[in-house]
Amino acid sequence: VLGKTESHLYRRGNFNGTFDDVINQAIMEERDTQISLSPGFRWGATLLPGQDIRVEDIFSQTAITYPAVYRNEMTGKFLKEILEDVGDNLFNPDPYYQQGGDMVRVGGMGYHFEINNKIGSRVSNMTLLKTGEKIDPVKTYIVGGWASVNEATKGPAIYDVVSNYIKREKSIIIKENRAVKIKGI
């Protein structure tokens, strides 16, 4: 047993879930980053308030072939490009260009997403949550993430990062996350 959850933990939404919030918080704290990115998977068992969080639960949320958690510098412009690209895979009006069902999960940053806009104009109002400042396209931010298919990616495995975070915190309480505002649903 790593810890206990006082919140309902799941990965079921198209833009985020509470287990995604735990994963992103773990990345930011364990890798000392301003922003975190986590792949939009909808798998793993849901945990109810009061349940123990076991190593098996972490594996069920994070078990993939490329678990290394990177820590890189990215510009605000590049962060927007990532969100726009993934968003276009989901919401391109031509179904032949739709390649996925889940948006990348983001920690430490909020943004607005307009589903019906074209690529390049869906993401706006990107904000660094810790300070409230707008994300500057030319400024560099420290970003952590995982599930990179780049073979050169170095860093600890995501299941170790999350396990260490939960062991340290002992009790997990997730507040409602409204950092991403979705329009056009």
Model-assigned labels for residue ranges:
Residues 1-185:
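Catalytic centers of hydrolytic enzymes
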